[in-house]
């Protein structure tokens, strides 16, 4: 389940207000033509089922999403990811591949103050690893090859399929 996200901003005095120039989003989707690593997801700003209190969405994204502990454990959560990045794509793809669905609850709205920069150091090699791990575990071969090729062209030293394959084998075996 995914809540509707309301974009908020915080000014220099710490006052929080709704961001007026950000359109309402309805979950997220995976663009197939993108200059970033795969899997990458973008906000979906098109409502497919106006008037409905909920609708299926390709990917969860934003301030709040939830599952029962039992289902999370069954899916093995975010096991295998080594750092922040690709969390929503990973869990969403696992849900769909397992036969579940990602559902947006339009009446549940959570405000989220988005920051311009992360307060922690971004580790691009770990983000690349996460993307390649997800590709190797959850994509069909044709998309897996495309994902690895894109990662290699962007960063040959971090796109080592052998490392992801070792990690994939360990996760798949458990």
Model-derived regions, located:
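Catalytic cores of nucleotide-sugar-dependent glycosyltransferases that transfer UDP/GDP/TDP-activated
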Residues: 3, 9, 66-67, 109, ...
